[in-house]
């Protein structure tokens, strides 16, 4: 009997630990039914860049920002310093640029989940200062998360939850959602998180593990199968003429005629 009791004590943390599942999909259709027919009172959380939409120009695409940070780091700048230095340029470019929806089925899925009275919101690394342009971009593709009227206590000044969008002001996903969960009067029965980067999906999984929240992480790779928008040479030309952001086609024409020299 004593041995059984000891085994129970040793195994009980494993028994009570919340489940974690990570899957990779090419299209939202592969997982839509699982989400819609999940009986749990879950939160469905979407990343924004390269999941809901992507920049339609090489310069406005998230890849330009990422590559620019990598370039500054190669010169010895810290990741945080590079991010902070480039952010004003990135924000100005977002205000000028246009966007392309990744997959038309996503708004339909969001509407269906909202009609089930379940929580759906977006979570981005973007800074609080980007909230206006972000909400404008979402409106352009007729996406609204305003139904996610979640109560919460105070948040740090660099984190903001407005109109169903959580702005984490962070280089890497995780801390923003952690603080948001800390501010909740009650936790969800489950979190379903969709992001195009696996490392972000894993980080959110760690946050949910700490909170003992069952988790389904979805690595959403649809954008990788689209024709590339970010092209370094095109982005370079667009940066030269960034006072009025030109399209990839116009930049390619300038390149062919050597008008950028």
UniProtKB/Swiss-Prot annotation:
The keyword Membrane applies. It is a peripheral membrane protein. Keywords: Cell outer membrane, Membrane, Signal. InterPro entries: DUF2608. It holds the Pfam family DUF2608. It comes from Chlamydia trachomatis serovar D (strain ATCC VR-885 / DSM 19411 / UW-3/Cx). Coiled coil: none annotated. Residues 1-18 form the signal peptide. It is found in: Cell outer membrane. This is Putative outer membrane protein CT_371. The keyword Kinase does not apply. It comes from the Bacteria. One of its GO terms (cellular component) is cell outer membrane. Disulfide bonds: none annotated.
